[in-house]
Amino acid sequence: MDPCSSLFSYVFMHLFVLCLQAQVTVQSPPNFTQHVREQSLVTDQLSRRLVRTYQLYSRTSGKHVQILDNKKINAMAEDGDVHAKLIVETDTFGSRVRIKGAATGFYICMNKKGKLIGKSNGKGKDCVFTEIVLENNYTALQNAKYEGWYMAFTRKGRPRKGSKTRQHQREVHFMKRLPKGHQTTEPHRRFEFLNYPFNRRSKRTRNSSASLRP
């Protein structure tokens, strides 16, 4: 066999093997979108919980959602009512939340019949709701356990069964409002001017700048 041909074959085979190894070692980049979607479906036990306090204004009743001492839930509370103050805890780093009354400590949950009920223990998936911001700037709250079922109230403020709700219905539309007298941040403070002492270098710089002026 011709030595040149043998050398060419050897080099070709060597390059071919290197190409195969490179194809095996190269991995596809991680799909971050899929990771977020999967993690949003489970309770996040590691991240720090974000806690917010606000009222839920019902579009249909014109009143606010409240959780009473007897665990009943309705949308008949006036602005600033003690039972209308809600504590909202994030369940994942997505938009899933748990809602409980600040006065009673009961969580808003949904049973298998689609009825809103109050529970002292809100760890179940039936007490988790997904916040959906709609095009009209209202927010819909879909139950995490019963997909397609929403928190809803009638014009009289009575809870409506989740099995009879749809996202486009006015009964499922809410607006977040801060309780009366609740401030998100501290009052603005006036600016304080500090007397910064000049050192030798700053004095020299100031004098040189003054000498350069016409």
Curated annotation (Swiss-Prot):
Assigned protein family: Belongs to the heparin-binding growth factors family.
MF terms in GO = growth factor activity; type 1 fibroblast growth factor receptor binding; type 2 fibroblast growth factor receptor binding
Q: Can you say where in the cell this protein is located?
A: Secreted
Q: Which PROSITE patterns match?
A: HBGF_FGF
**Which Pfam family is an annotated match for this chain, by its short name?**
FGF
Q: GO cellular component annotations, sorted alphabetically? A: cytoplasm; extracellular space
Q: Which UniProt keywords apply?
A: Developmental protein, Differentiation, Glycoprotein, Growth factor, Mitogen, Secreted, Signal
Chain positions carrying an annotated carbohydrate = 31, 137, 207
Database matches in SMART domains = FGF (SM00442)
What is this protein's function?
Answer: Plays an important role in the regulation of embryonic development, cell proliferation, cell differentiation and cell migration. Involved in initiation, outgrowth and patterning of the limbs.
> Which residues constitute the signal peptide according to the record?
1-22
What are the GO BP annotations of this UniProt entry? Answer: dorsal/ventral pattern formation; embryonic pattern specification; epithelial-mesenchymal cell signaling; fibroblast growth factor receptor signaling pathway; limb bud formation; limb development; neurogenesis; positive regulation of cell division
Instruction: Provide the protein name.
Output: Fibroblast growth factor 8
Q: Which domain of life is it from?
A: Eukaryota
Q: Which InterPro entries match?
A: Fibroblast_GF_fam (IPR002209), IL1/FGF (IPR008996)
- Major site of localization recorded for this protein: secreted
